[in-house]
Amino acid sequence: MTEKTIRLTTAQALVKFLNQQYIEVDGEMAPFVDGIFTLFGHGNVVGIGQALEEAPGHLKVYQGKNEQGMAHAAIAYAKQKNRQRIYACSTSAGPGSANLITAAGTALANNLPVLFLPADTFATRQPDPVLQQLEHESSTAITTNDGFQAVSRYFDRVQRPEQLMSALIRAFEVMTNPASAGPATICIAQDTEGEAFDYPVEFFQKRIHYLNRQIPTKRELTEAARLIKASKTPVIIVGGGARYSRAREELIALSEQTNIPLVETHAGKSTLEFDFKNNLGGTGILGTLAANKAIRDADLVIGIGTRYTDFTTSSKTAFDPTTKFININVSRMQTYKLDAFQVVGDAKATLAELAPLLKGYQTQFGNKIAAYKTEWLDERARLQTTKFNRETFTPEIKDQFDQAILNEYADRLQTEFTQTEALITINDNVAPDSIVVCSAGSLPGDLQRLWNPAVPDTYHLEYGYSCMGYEINGALGAKMAAAKKQEVYAIVGDGSFCMSHSELLTSLQYGKKINIMLFDNSGFGCINNLQMANGSDSFFCEFRDSDNQIMQVDYAKIAEGYGAKVYRANTKEDLISALEDAKTQSKTTLIEMKVLPKTMSEGYLNWWNVGVSEVSNKESIKQAYEEKQANLKNARLY
């Protein structure tokens, strides 16, 4: 190291360092940090704000409208870029920083890299307690930002300018490591942001972070091949790791070579297009009938880049007790799940090495894969044409709302539109390369089952944290990451819209057109289904006023007030017309659809373990508890 230095404030050094971070994947190099979202307040406006104003470099700066909302946009950007490009997020101290914590949980649960820069209290403590500072009798060192420790892959505090160097180097190692990718949080004391230091110039050299494709050992590959050859009906679960590895070609080649069917997690969906003959779609609690039948048949499950969440495993009841597992993952920790044979490696590289070892091998599925897929497509076609009537209508979610209640909803919402018909209509009428973004409620289930991606990397579901309010804000991030003319559709329920839609305004502010598909069934329909399916009555999940009337909300008018182009569509014909006109618009659009409750799709061959009350005065809850205990007898314990 030379003795040459450059005098900068801590914040200026931060911005200069971010400009010098690059990532190289398969010989292609690009900047790793494309920009920064910020909401200025005391704690960052005169520190990081000054540094960005004076010398932003190539960093694009976006003004967020809510800290959680802008952070979800940053998370979606990283997800859509397959974890190879990021945005940072800077906030003020106190509540501004606290608003990031939920989003940090979203990033951590989904293994997505984001750099969080929450401002902190004074390092000198001279003016304490400052505005928005918490006071604890037990410790002066505790601040709001301690809440980040549970939701960060890497957490650090900078209270002296020279601490920035080691903090940033460690943070970027974590964010650019496929095995540990996740949010890095660096809390910078607000007085330290403006404090100057003579930094060594070498700290600001161009740094290239290489995403090397880890190849498993010969032992791992040989044993994995032996286990596959010994199986008769293996199934591959395509997880998010397969998508981030860009393993599409290798998955197709191996499946064609061996006739192994493919099923998908939310994170893995659209790694390859649905039209591939052996792709049976989503698996688990929200899976297709075809995928869940294949998993039920499996004597070997090959999990590629999956965390095996309860929604993938149906709370560990989806598999036969004798089923064996091979787990291929860059994270050694993930490979240990379900007592699997562990293969630590990159999905794309591992599949390329494995294929030659399986030469001549064929599963015994035969024509069963095609039969399962045909049966499922027939079921999807039925769901596309469900029609309401006022006398004998049976919704997909049966035995919860009677005809009178459904008629009440039809009258109050002035609609007979079913949710499944509306969703499939959207799928059939948007451009094939359109990106669909969703996160929470009943819509992820419909998307996992019914949305058929025609182009890879166009299905964008945040289902690690399933955070309400991600949809619209995440759509902005996906749009920022998308090709110039690629349309992005936020699929959102009225519940999630109410939770957060702050970056709708940001999309209009910066000309980043998104299309918001708002499904209004006047309530938290997904959770209403859950409570009633487990013996409870409908209780505080419907949007009813103090007179027990179903609420009537004009969500389109809210978006219109922001400046969006809006439509109201309560029939298939009106929806198609709105979709076509929305394609011609240059600014953000919102299509409001009033849909009937209980008309979302129901599960197939699945079960979800939830905390049903063991003691109750209601017979229906007692029965639900007994059913839970019976299902647990078929579940793996770990």
UniProtKB/Swiss-Prot annotation:
- Which cofactors does this protein require? Mg(2+); thiamine diphosphate
Biological process, per Gene Ontology: inositol catabolic process; isoleucine biosynthetic process; L-valine biosynthetic process
Q: Where is this region: Thiamine pyrophosphate binding?
A: 442-523
Q: What is its EC number?
A: 3.7.1.22
Q: Give the pathway.
A: Polyol metabolism; myo-inositol degradation into acetyl-CoA; acetyl-CoA from myo-inositol: step 3/7
Which residues are involved in binding Mg(2+)?
Answer: D494, N521
Instruction: Return the GO cellular component terms, semicolon-separated.
Output: acetolactate synthase complex
Instruction: List positions binding thiamine diphosphate.
Output: E67
What is the catalytic activity of this protein? Answer: 3D-3,5/4-trihydroxycyclohexane-1,2-dione + H2O = 5-deoxy-D-glucuronate + H(+)
Instruction: Cite the CDD domains for this sequence.
Output: TPP_PYR_POX_like (cd07035)
Q: Name one GO molecular function term.
A: thiamine pyrophosphate binding
Keyword DNA repair among record annotations: no
Using the record for this protein, list the coiled-coil segments as residue ranges, or answer none.
Answer: none
Which top-level enzyme class is recorded in the Swiss-Prot or TrEMBL entry? hydrolase
Q: Write the record's keywords in alphabetical order, separated by commas.
A: Hydrolase, Magnesium, Metal-binding, NAD, Thiamine pyrophosphate
How is its cofactor bound, per UniProt?
A: Binds 1 Mg(2+) ion per subunit. Binds 1 thiamine pyrophosphate per subunit.
The protein's role, per its UniProt record: Involved in the cleavage of the C1-C2 bond of 3D-(3,5/4)-trihydroxycyclohexane-1,2-dione (THcHDO) to yield 5-deoxy-glucuronate (5DG).
Name the protein family.
Belongs to the TPP enzyme family.
Instruction: Kindly provide the name given to this protein in its UniProt entry.
Output: 3D-(3,5/4)-trihydroxycyclohexane-1,2-dione hydrolase
The uppermost taxa in this organism's lineage are:
Bacteria, Bacillati, Bacillota, Bacilli, Bacillales
